[in-house]
């Protein structure tokens, strides 16, 4: 059987009709699935010894969130090494990466598979995969015909990557000015909220502006900081991380600015602080809202003048550091309450970013679940970890108060439970493997709600609510602060600090 000229022309036309790359890619693989009458098709990008799905048709949605490493998927490794059309026989010993991921056929193995490596010159840039439940599905198509399809797909992908590279070098009008393409390996999500966030990251990454990253706990603010650093001219230099919430007041200044020998008891040698470590690079200050006012003043001076002073030293050191800061607090409210310096807030928030909570990201929940399933599969040495349709619906219907971090923990816990109840190395996650309900966390009793004063302002009511939550967590965990922190899904240092601010401890 040969492709009619009209079919190839139709594929080429479809590649030009899309508004953006994603739309073109989707049109391509949808058209190919129809023309080849197969059950599933996928376009994958090759990067750092792994294949990243760009567009799929006929596969479960969570495939878009998975990252297929060559080491973990022998068929994809064979495609990457082949340099030409690869046909896998129905009795192939190599597991198919999409087994259990074709909707309606979850319990059946994929029988026929064709892999088409995609090249730009001599460089592997991606692959097309075609799968069918019928063993002889692709025998009617010659290798030459499939090479034509691969050439069309490679051209589309190569053009998209070239445009991305040109935009990253500020060579196109209206481009973002990003120094190099941002790798989106861990920035998973196609929702409007995440698409907007990625655009904003691209805009600010190539500049040298300080960035304030806001968002609820567990949304992935550290990943945003990493993406900004990777897309900046400073990417060749260090990205240094510091959690301000975990800093005891007595050592916070030394951690930030360093100290000299003899500056205080225990200072037995000179020590560089985080600012020195990040010189010519980027410093990420997580939970910036937890810094004391005294340290805020010293941080402001560094941002204003670019010099630091080690504890116990009279000399100043010049540093060139870009500061990225993150917080789950409303710093405007903190400024009004006198807990955060207004001048520091304005210095940090030159370009503010907001990471959306998971409940506002729609189907991204499923994509992220696929990513974590693949992580668990590799970590535990399983042949496959897939979500049942019921499990997908269950994940979509939950509110995720702990955001992406809670989803990650839920997937890991579900895999362990499912593995314990099923023999073999194949795991299917069902709804019953997830303990997702609004009463998972300790909740205030009805009596405690009634006991709260009804005429307080919002801040006072919020603080009363926080006090009640902490009291109940402590009571339910025998006043063990570490266990209470785990129950409330916060770190123990942050819980101690909050309890002290709320007057629950000295």
UniProtKB/Swiss-Prot annotation:
Residues 481-500 bind DNA. Pathway: Nitrogen metabolism; nitric oxide reduction. The keyword Nucleotide-binding applies. GO terms for molecular function: ATP binding; ATP hydrolysis activity; DNA binding; DNA-binding transcription factor activity. Gene3D superfamilies: 1.10.8.60, 3.30.450.40, Homeodomain-like, P-loop containing nucleotide triphosphate hydrolases. InterPro entries: AAA+_ATPase, GAF, GAF-like_dom_sf, Homeodomain-like_sf, NorR, P-loop_NTPase, Sigma_54_int, Sigma_54_int_dom_ATP-bd_1. ATP binds at residues 215-222, 278-287. Residues 187-416 form the Sigma-54 factor interaction domain. It comes from the Bacteria. GO terms for biological process: phosphorelay signal transduction system. The modification 4-aspartylphosphate is found at residue 57. Keywords: ATP-binding, DNA-binding, Nucleotide-binding, Phosphoprotein, Transcription, Transcription regulation. The keyword Transcription regulation applies. It holds the Pfam family GAF. Required for the expression of anaerobic nitric oxide (NO) reductase, acts as a transcriptional activator for at least the norVW operon. Activation also requires sigma-54. HAMAP family: NorR. This is Anaerobic nitric oxide reductase transcription regulator NorR.
């Amino acid at each position: 059987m040969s492709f009619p000229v009209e079919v190839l022309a139709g594929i080429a036309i479809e590649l030009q009709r899309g508004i953006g790359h994603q739309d073109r890619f989707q049109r391509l693989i949808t058209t190919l699935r129809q023309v080849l009458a197969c059950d599933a098709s996928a376009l994958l990008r090759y990067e750092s010894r792994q294949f990243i799905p760009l567009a799929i048709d006929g596969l479960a949605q969570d495939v878009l969130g998975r990252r297929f490493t060559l080491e973990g998927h022998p068929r994809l490794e064979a495609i990457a090494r082949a340099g030409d059309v690869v046909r896998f026989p129905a009795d192939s010993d190599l597991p198919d990466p999409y087994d259990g991921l074709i909707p309606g056929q979850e319990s059946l193995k994929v029988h026929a598979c064709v892999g088409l490596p995609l090249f730009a010159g001599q460089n592997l840039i991606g692959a097309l995969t075609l799968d069918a439940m019928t063993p002889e599905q692709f025998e009617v198509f010659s290798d030459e015909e499939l090479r034509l399809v691969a050439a069309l797909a490679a051209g589309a992908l190569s053009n998209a990557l070239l445009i991305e590279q040109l935009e990253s070098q500020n060579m196109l009008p209206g481009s973002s000015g990003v120094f190099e393409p941002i790798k989106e390996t861990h920035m998973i999500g196609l929702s409007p909220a995440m698409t907007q966030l990625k655009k904003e990251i691209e805009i600010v990454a190539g500049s040298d502006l300080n960035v304030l990253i806001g968002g609820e706990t567990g949304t992935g603010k550290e990943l945003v900081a990493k993406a900004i650093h990777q897309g900046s001219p400073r990417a060749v230099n260090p990205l240094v991380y510091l959690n301000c919430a975990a800093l005891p007041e007595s050592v916070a200044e030394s951690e930030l600015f360093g100290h000299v020998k003899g500056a205080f008891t225990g200072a037995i040698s000179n020590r560089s602080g985080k600012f020195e470590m990040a010189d010519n690079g980027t410093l990420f200050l997580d939970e910036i809202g937890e810094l004391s006012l005294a340290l805020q003043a010293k941080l402001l001076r560094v941002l204003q003048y670019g010099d630091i002073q080690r504890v116990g030293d009279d000399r100043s050191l010049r540093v060139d550091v870009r500061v990225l800061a993150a917080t789950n607090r409303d710093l405007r409210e903190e400024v009004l309450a006198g807990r955060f310096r207004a001048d520091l807030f304005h210095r940090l928030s030159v370009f503010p970013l907001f990471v959306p909570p998971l409940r506002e990201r729609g189907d991204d929940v499923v994509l992220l679940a696929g990513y974590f399933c693949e992580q668990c599969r590799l970590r535990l040495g399983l042949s496959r970890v897939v979500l049942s349709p019921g499990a997908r619906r269950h994940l979509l219907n939950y509110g995720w108060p702990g955001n992406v971090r809670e989803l990650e923990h839920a997937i890991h816990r579900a895999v362990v439970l499912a593995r314990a109840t099923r023999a073999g190395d194949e795991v299917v996650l069902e709804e019953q493997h997830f303990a997702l309900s609004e009463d998972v966390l300790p909740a205030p009793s009805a009596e405690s709600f009634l006991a709260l004063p009804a005429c307080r302002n919002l801040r006072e009511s919020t603080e009363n609510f926080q006090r009640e939550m902490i009291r109940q967590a402590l009571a339910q965990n025998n006043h063990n602060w570490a266990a209470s922190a785990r129950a409330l899904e916060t770190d123990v240092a942050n819980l101690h600090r909050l309890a002290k601010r709320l007057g629950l401890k000295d």
